[in-house]
Amino acid sequence: MTNGQLYINGKDAYLTWGIFLDETALSTLMTPAPNKEFISNKYRSKDGKSVIKHNPRLDEREITLAFNMTAKDSDTFMTNYARFCEEVLAKGELVIRTRFQPNVWYRCIYLSCTQFSQFVREMAKFSLKLNEPDPSDRGETSKYTS
């Protein structure tokens, strides 16, 4: 059952647009964000380099999430596709939550979309390239909201 699996901007993606996670998408989301580079300095008078290792911070990350889209017929598919583009992609911000991690909200910026693969009128597979600007901001309410 694919409804209740994925929420985008607070909406059940399957019930709203017929979209559900591809088999690789969850592991992509769960991949830890990289750290920012540590502050370091190479002194000419010392061997190696000095690295300040305390207080590591997360860096932004770019991810490519694979999705599947399905509908009962080609007209519904085209309608759902147009609505998804208008309601989500055109606004540029996606807040993604899954039933597998119910207390984690991924706040991402839409960058681009791949061409549909396996397009068969009522179903398709596509990938969204997203930027997660602050991987530490994954609570129910954004820490940047006033």
Residue ranges and their predicted role:
Residues 1-146:
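Extracellular/virion structural assembly segments
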